[in-house]
A protein has these predicted regions:
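Active-site C-terminal subdomain of aminotransferase-like
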Residues: 1-110, 114-152
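PLP-dependent enzyme catalytic core of the Aspartate aminotransferase-like
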Residues: 118-122, 130, 145-194
Length: 194
């Protein structure tokens, strides 16, 4: 419920199954763990729903523009955004997310860049720290733009060729001006990766 809540600060969801045995297991787990959604979280979500379309569309548009711009930056070996034709999974994304209602598809405000392998993780961390508008953070869908570096090999097993590309940095685009965010990335590149 990150996007529906409007602030990226509500964690909630649902599990739906046609399997009765699995439904009973899930219900028992829910009862035993005592998990549930608080009234304040529900209120936040209900209050934010009317602006969901506007927020999602804005963040999607900004993320596409910045991701496209990042493709022209030589320090990035790859840009991972499903709407970009060069991005892995683009064809699959088109099948799922492009249709009559949304001819250009929907892709949210999240994308990643793979910083060229010539740069160390220390340099990539310095790049993220040098950003002035982007804040370090793991969330998404909120009004502020966030960035977080991560090393894929420490998170999951991936094919060796993919690991050779470099360190991944995830950007979550908020509501700041696109030109300001691009300028922020550019100044951080010049300060740390050149």
């Amino acid at each position: 419920a990150k996007y529906p809540s409007g602030g990226g600060d509500v964690l909630m969801g649902s599990i739906i199954t046609r399997n009765d045995a699995l439904a009973r297991t899930i219900k028992l787990s829910h009862m035993r763990l005592g998990t549930g959604v608080g009234a304040n979280d529900v209120e936040t979500l209900l209050r934010s729903l009317p602006t969901l379309e506007m927020r999602y569309t804005s963040q999607d548009k900004s993320a596409r523009e910045i991701a496209s711009w990042c493709e022209s930056q030589p320090v990035f070996a790859q840009v991972l955004h499903p709407a970009l034709p060069k991005s892995p999974g683009h064809i699959h994304w088109q099948k799922l997310c492009v249709g009559e209602q949304y001819p250009k598809g929907r892709a949210a405000g999240i994308f990643s860049v793979v910083v060229d392998a010539q740069f160390s993780t220390t340099q990539v961390d310095a790049f993220c720290d040098a950003l002035r508008i982007f804040k370090i953070g793991y969330s998404w869908a909120g009004p502020m733009s966030l960035v977080v570096p991560y090393q894929k090999q420490n998170i999951r097993t991936l094919p060796a060729p993919h690991l050779k590309l470099g360190t991944v940095v995830r950007f979550c685009i908020g509501f700041e001006d696109v030109a300001d965010l691009q300028a922020d990335i550019q100044q951080a590149i010049h300060a740390t990766l050149v």
